[in-house]
Amino acid sequence: MASYKSRVIDVTIVNRLRNKGAILVEGAKWCGKTTTCEQHASSILYMSDPDRVKQNLQLADISPRSLLQGETPRLIDEWQMAPKLWDAVRFEVDHRDGFGHFLLTGSAVPAEMEQVHHTGTGRFAWIKMRPMSLYESGESSGAVSLSELFSPDDKPIFAENKATLENIAFLICRGGWPQATFLEGDDALVQAFDYLDAVVKSDISRVDGVSRNETRARLLMRSLARHQGTQAPNTTICEDINVSDDMELSKDTVVSYTNALKKIFVIEDCPAWSPNLRSKTAIRTSDTRYFVDPSIATASLGIGPGDLLNDLETCGLFFETLCIRDLRVYAEALDGSVYHFRTKEGLECDAVIHLRNGSYGLVEVKLGGDRLIEEGAHTLKTVADKIDTTKMKEPSFLMVLTGTSPYAYQRKDGVYVVPITALKN
């Protein structure tokens, strides 16, 4: 059996078990939730165990507390199969001393939320888990720490980057699926296609019991792949499918299918950032579209690393999705979130990492090359100059996040240039 690769949220789980009665770890299928939580559990209930699933569901209906007995922390895997367990866990937490009693994992938002009578406020901690970042999968050296960039100490950075464009294209298409990181070549690449098949054939319908058409689901996924990193509205997605794929999809259908994909954590759009600006510039408030992993986009389009190398514009588009995935993993370990900034005049910043203490950093994503890095640095300085620092902090750092830059370093103008294969939390 493959050995366990440590995850960034391991530390978060340990910390939250010290101060919360229960933790819910949720995220896309195959991203490693169960394996990670197994490392922290003293006893485990697998709700989907085929030998016990029928009995588990019956017990969850008539005597849910009986399923919660066992050494703590007790892991309840795929709890959403029996939503009544939520209230049972909440009740147990209320009537037990101390913290760290339960770990729950879920790969979908339950369809029968009406069976949940209490939100769990104050008892539960919610942790979002995503496919592996490059630091977790071992493809990033971690020589540059995001937390250190937020530090007031202006420490110099330096690291070598040996990643080639071919490496980056492979990592985009392989994705961060833990199982794939133990494989090589085509064996690793096929995992994303298997994930896509599971989504469109089954998961998109199972999430809420609504039967959805596989062909329509595939067409929607293809269109969403073509619109990664954009604020394309549903009407644009409809038009794209109708023109590109010669099939009529109504706006209601797109909304229904998209909402289902969000419930199973396939889609994770990036919210807009609204800073205080010096001028009355209109800021776009629409979310920016992203899959939770770039390999979903390439699998949806049926393409591989070779195709990306022949189309660097598309490669750059999906490289951005990869970087957003990694930045989310690292930012949340620092109690931060990732946003997108764009004005109606077209000035934009690919990622804004905003921490709870009000600190923030501005990030532009560029695949590589001196010209693109220069463009990214210019954009970052332009955005920074527009921020009203009498009403909010100055940015802690400006960073161009690259794929093929040979080094991580700080430019004379203060802008950091960091290869994604050198970054960690």
What annotation goes with each model-predicted range?
Residues E114-T230:
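Interdomain motor-coupling "hinge/lid" segment immediately C-terminal to the ATP-binding subdomain
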Residues M1-V14:
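N-terminal pre-Walker A segment at the start of P-loop NTPase domains
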Residues T181-S359:
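Accessory nucleic acid-recognition modules appended to NTPase machines
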Residues V25:
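Hydrophobic anchor at the beta1->P-loop junction of P-loop NTPases
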Residues G403-N425:
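Domain-level recognition of nuclease-like catalytic cores that cleave nucleotide substrates
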Residues L45-P73:
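Short glycine-rich substrate-engagement loop in P-loop NTPases that contacts/grips substrate
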Residues W86-P110, H118:
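Conserved catalytic/switch belt of AAA+ P-loop NTPases
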Residues K33-T34:
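Conserved lysine of the Walker
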